[in-house]
Amino acid sequence: MGRYDNLVHTFRKQYNHWGDFMPPYQAYFRGHDCLPDSSFYSSYRCYMKEAFIDKEPNFHSEEEYLCFTGYDMLDPWGTFDADIEFWIGEKLSKLEKHIINKPTIVRIPPFFWHCPLQYHRVGKPVYLQVLGTRGKFGTYVCRLDGKGGYSIEYTGLSGQKKCVMDPEKKCTVCGKCYRAREKAEDPKNATESALRYRSFDF
């Protein structure tokens, strides 16, 4: 045991079940849950095919960054070959669409709405790194009730939420519950989703 073992974290390969648009594994640094007193959070993912999983606008109480590059670290520019639709705005009524088609980093200020996010075309794998500036990283989501109303739902701290499939375990964002929770009335694309929120001026 070293004196500073508490400052060193070894990544664990976490298997996921999102679908064939991702490799069967992912890596996470869950801030305080990995290194006590950490003020940083990060996930590391590869998208290999078209995908639409971030369907609802959300915000965090801390600043967040989304970094998109080509997956080949020897040439992250030359290997970027994708079209990604991303929405962001200070209010839901002001959500603005951006098309990402080259290596890009997005700064998301605290309490700024962001998403939906959709990978429309993926010619080559895309590397996404999510960076949160807090060791305990939680998400607030706007949920529509289908009757013109809404609720703001706090989905809990990452690393602390219970698994939907097995409440005895913690959620690892493995995606196993993703398909099971899909509904027929869910938006089919990012633009459709974003436009559903345009009437909410907050």
Model-derived regions, located:
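Short acidic (Asp/Glu) patches
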Residues: 50-52, 88-94, 109-113
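Beta-rich globular "head" domains
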Residues: 61-65, 69
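A short beta-strand-loop-beta hairpin characteristic of the jelly-roll/cupin
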Residues: 68-101, 139-141
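Conserved metal-binding segment of the jelly-roll/cupin
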Residues: 97-119
